Amino acid sequence: MAIYSILIHPDPRLRLPAQPVTHFDDALAEIVQNMYETMYHFHGIGLAAPQVNIQQRLIVMDVPQRSAEEGEKAEQIPSDKLVLVNPEIVQRSEECQDYEEGCLSLPNQYALVTRPANITVRYQDITGATQERAAQGLLSVCIQHEIDHLNGGLFIDHLSRLKRERLEKKLAKSLKNTKKS
């Protein structure tokens, strides 16, 4: 197993659209395992292949589920570990939700992003079998966020120009200070 390097914005490779996966073999399984290792190493809940300079339509996720009962403290329950190959959103709700998003490619930068609250995603699993799944809450946000990466997008693309530029300046300053250390 290997831990990949994460591409950091404004690396232009993050803006390249990924190509469909066509081979469902041991090499793909190894990439998936390495992506999980990388995601866990950097404390992420989702990782798209383009973030590790693999230009394929491939996502790994391990999204914590929480109890939806109101008035109670959200209880941690088993996570939703998913591999999505060649995913596409086939249905979006009109209802939207705001969620504070972060990204391994924009370290320590967060912003409130509005996205459809509920989606249905069609994808292939690691064997190439077509699957379809409904998602809501954090899982819905994570799927949409990672699919943005496959299309050459970032969560900051959903922000106003002013908020995006402010966040990019904070990131540049943070990276500059990290290099000095």
Swiss-Prot record:
Co-factor binding comment: Binds 1 Fe(2+) ion.
Highest taxon in the source lineage: Bacteria
InterPro entries reported for this sequence: Peptide_deformylase, Peptide_deformylase_sf
Active site: 146
Keywords on record: Hydrolase, Iron, Metal-binding, Protein biosynthesis
Pfam families: Pep_deformylase (PF01327)
Signal peptide: none
Residues the record lists as binding Fe cation: 103, 145, 149
Catalysis performed (reactions): N-terminal N-formyl-L-methionyl-[peptide] + H2O = N-terminal L-methionyl-[peptide] + formate
GO biological process: co-translational protein modification; translation
Molecular function in Gene Ontology: metal ion binding; peptide deformylase activity
Keyword NAD: no
Essential cofactor(s): Fe(2+)
EC number(s) from the headed UniProt entry: 3.5.1.88
Classification via CDD domains: Pep_deformylase
Protein family membership: Belongs to the polypeptide deformylase family.
Protein task: Removes the formyl group from the N-terminal Met of newly synthesized proteins. Requires at least a dipeptide for an efficient rate of reaction. N-terminal L-methionine is a prerequisite for activity but the enzyme has broad specificity at other positions.
Protein name: Peptide deformylase
